[in-house]
Amino acid sequence: MTKRILFTGGGTVGHVTLNLILIPKFLKDGWEVHYIGDKKGIEYQEIQKSGYPVTFHAIKTGKLRRYFSWQNLIDVFKVATGLLQSLVIINKVKPQALFSKGGFVSVPPVIASRLMGVPVFVHESDLSMGLANKIALKFASTMYTTFESQVTNPIIKHIGAVTKVSKESGNYLPELSDIQNKFNPQLKTLLFIGGSAGAKVFNQLITNNPDLTKAFNVINITGDSQLNELSQNLYRVDYVTDLYQPLMQLADLVITRGGSNTLFELLAMQKLHLIVPLGKEASRGDQLENANYFEKQGYARQLSEELFNPETLISEVHYLLEHQDQFRKAMSESQEIKSPDVFYDLLKNDISLKAKGK
């Protein structure tokens, strides 16, 4: 009997990353892999770029809002359409399980899977759940959480952060020779990572303050190909895949938003980092919670976007560098990182138990 698994999740890179870690493991073990998402969403782009033999099923999707908006009336019909489409897909594919990484597009497949008797496994990365995963929790067989859950529920399993990077991930520096030739080896190297939604503020600061490259080598992942540049002490690139971890290793310090995936990658690498979280006006507040947690644990410092400017940036960078031993000690003592292989084995075992009715 062919083993089949459905994945869902999208809207941002963070809702796809873990799926892309797990998919090749299922493929290697002989599973047939399917993905439900929005063909206009980043999940479709990432699956296509991966080259994995995954069957992508597109559905309609609508945003779920906690506040009144006339757009809600339209999106209700989109979600309902997505639910019907998901029911048809699941009936056709007949998967043994659905794994959801969250995002608005995941809600219809999660509900449809439960209605069709397919076990639903959900992953939550943030300290508090978004609306999509709050809904998913009601239909899930198991929910895995990165942080200790604030909700008491027997189906919730705290597993820590699943990341494929580590402090011992290898030396990639020869691949960066062109960039290194432009950098001053006497200067510290800063890496700015804004994520799919938060790079603009970092881009503007670097564009408006060219003197920053007199004090530091600067790497800026911009999300905007028009800003691509390699010049003295400056490398700006819109998007990276294979170079992502090498650039992380090259950096002495990373300035990042508060997305949990990136934060836990930095923790796994024991990389100094300054968090500039998206505020509640640009997110549901999860990045603020993540940043507060990391600062409280002693892993990082945070700086609000309102106070983010060249002077405060340089001040925080100097503080982190001067106190790097204490931050690295806190990160080295963390027990929050779980390897993808360990999580994959746990997930496979849970799927097997559900198949046996346990």
Swiss-Prot record:
Enumerate the residues binding UDP-N-acetyl-alpha-D-glucosamine. 196, 287
- Molecular function terms, GO-annotated: undecaprenyldiphospho-muramoylpentapeptide beta-N-acetylglucosaminyltransferase activity
Q: Which gene encodes it?
A: murG
Instruction: Give the reactions, separated by semicolons, that this protein catalyses.
Output: Mur2Ac(oyl-L-Ala-gamma-D-Glu-L-Lys-D-Ala-D-Ala)-di-trans,octa-cis-undecaprenyl diphosphate + UDP-N-acetyl-alpha-D-glucosamine = beta-D-GlcNAc-(1->4)-Mur2Ac(oyl-L-Ala-gamma-D-Glu-L-Lys-D-Ala-D-Ala)-di-trans,octa-cis-undecaprenyl diphosphate + UDP + H(+)
Q: What does this protein do?
A: Cell wall formation. Catalyzes the transfer of a GlcNAc subunit on undecaprenyl-pyrophosphoryl-MurNAc-pentapeptide (lipid intermediate I) to form undecaprenyl-pyrophosphoryl-MurNAc-(pentapeptide)GlcNAc (lipid intermediate II).
Q: How does it sit in the membrane?
A: Peripheral membrane protein
Q: Name one GO biological process term.
A: carbohydrate metabolic process
Record protein name field = UDP-N-acetylglucosamine--N-acetylmuramyl-(pentapeptide) pyrophosphoryl-undecaprenol N-acetylglucosamine transferase
Q: In terms of domain of life, where is this protein from?
A: Bacteria
Question: What Gene Ontology terms describe where this protein resides (cellular component)?
Answer: plasma membrane
Q: Which HAMAP family match?
A: MurG
